[in-house]
Amino acid sequence: MRFIYLFIALFSSFSIAQQPALRVISLSPHTTELAYAAGLGDALIAASDYSDYPEAAQKLERVANYRGVKLERIVALQPDLILAWKGGNPPREMAKLEQLGLNVFYSNPVELEDIATTIEQLGQYSPEPTQAIQTANQFRQEISAFKTRNENQRTVSFFYQLSDSPIITVADGSWPSQVFSLCGGRNIFGDSPAAYPQVSEEQVVVRQPEVIFGTPHADTKTSIWQNWQGKLPAVDNHHVFTLQADWLNRPTPRTINAIKQVCGLFDQVRDGTL
């Protein structure tokens, strides 16, 4: 009897987990994109600030931002699935939502493969899981093609600037270092013990990067690096580039666009065409 009871309990839990989610809330921009990629777009009823892709996401009610989440409003919306960013959304507020019995799915992509895996996992909540499977498989195929293409390329040293004041960069193992690594880049601060270290201008100059990358949030073309003319290879060779921030910093299918952009720039640096 005990075996039968356990079997019924496990089977019931499995069945519930596979039921399509009808009311979904996303608490970060990247989980919003992943939801659409997994076929959950029609089920989304609210999202976080800066959830701006695809265009349909811009019409969703806002229930989260960098300061936290609107707990009372989220509960009132009665979601059957909440998509959260592990490490990005406040743990205490997430715990409260779980204590209230709400179903919270945590996304925390670390490797490029994690994007495809997360899409497949979210697809289990979609009425059309085949969309998630197809999207994930296509992503894996494109990643595999880039790996094959770049495996014998010359390594290019680079510095990626997240912000101007203070100067923040990324270490190996932190998103989006995987994109640069796939394209044959060597992070000059890859060995930092901090995931997102704060560095000085002098530290960057000492490590002599061939390329400096920034985003529109850190306008490297007209910033401090131009003051180091003659001392920085990246500046002397005009290898200071601005990348599309959302492609690069959000772990979503659009990461492929970031890979194409970064790999293309590295190729031109290697070939001497820039």
Curated annotation (Swiss-Prot):
Binding site for cyanocob(III)alamin: Y50
Stated name of the protein: Vitamin B12-binding protein
Compartments, record wording: Periplasm
Domain of life: Bacteria
Gene name linked to the record: btuF
Signal peptide: 1-17
Domain Fe/B12 periplasmic-binding: 23-270
Glycoprotein is among the record's keywords: no
Family listed: Belongs to the BtuF family.
Positions of disulphide bridges: C183-C263
A molecular function GO annotation: cobalamin binding
